[in-house]
């Protein structure tokens, strides 16, 4: 939902987009499925932000914080090995992505990567021209937007072996619920690892 929508030719942060449409509405076009037959759209959102390529990235981290998150999440290009740009989850951009994708459900991935943090930062709002906003601005304004960061208590334990919602630490569940409420879409799936069975269904 987040990175895919922002790289879409029509809905993304042009000119830092792909040459095609990356939103869910165009999936039937390439697969031969009638659009009206889509009953559910599952948006995939990382528990933090990552970015490939140039362009505005409001909540981007630099230095040691960025490197720690990059190392924890193995955030480097599959072919080039180039380090990806990373930062806390951007709820403003994610909410926009959910809206333009028409998502009816969300799969929140890589929750386990945040397990090393005492306090987990989230970009809850933007500040633009001295005003706080929850609306995703026009691309030309993004360079001037500043992140408004809030913090959620971390859980500080390995959750990669957890296989049910109730087994997750309370603070991990609270983080998921916080994101869910902020983006206005149910999070039905939570990924806690790279294994096939590391997907928790709520």
Give the location of each predicted region:
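Non-transmembrane, aqueous-exposed alpha-helical and coiled segments at domain scale
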Residues: 2-202
């Amino acid at each position: 939902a987040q990175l895919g929508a922002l790289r879409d030719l029509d809905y993304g942060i042009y000119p830092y987009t792909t040459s095609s449409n990356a939103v869910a509405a165009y999936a039937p076009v390439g697969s031969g499925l009638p659009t009206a037959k889509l009953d559910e759209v599952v948006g995939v959102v990382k528990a933090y932000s990552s970015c490939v390529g140039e362009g505005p990235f409001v909540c981007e981290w630099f230095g040691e914080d960025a490197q720690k998150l990059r190392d924890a999440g193995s955030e480097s290009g599959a072919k080039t090995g180039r380090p990806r740009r990373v930062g806390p989850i951007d709820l403003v951009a994610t909410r926009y992505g959910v809206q333009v994708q028409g998502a009816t459900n969300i799969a929140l991935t890589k929750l386990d990567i945040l397990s090393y943090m005492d306090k987990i930062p989230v970009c809850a709002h933007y500040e633009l021209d001295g005003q706080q906003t929850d609306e995703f601005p026009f691309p030309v304004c993004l360079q001037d937007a500043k992140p408004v960061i809030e913090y959620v208590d971390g859980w500080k334990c390995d959750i990669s072996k957890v296989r049910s919602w109730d087994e997750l630490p309370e603070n991990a569940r609270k983080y998921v619920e916080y994101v869910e409420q902020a983006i206005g879409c149910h999070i039905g799936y939570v990924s806690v690892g790279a294994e096939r069975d590391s997907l928790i269904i709520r």
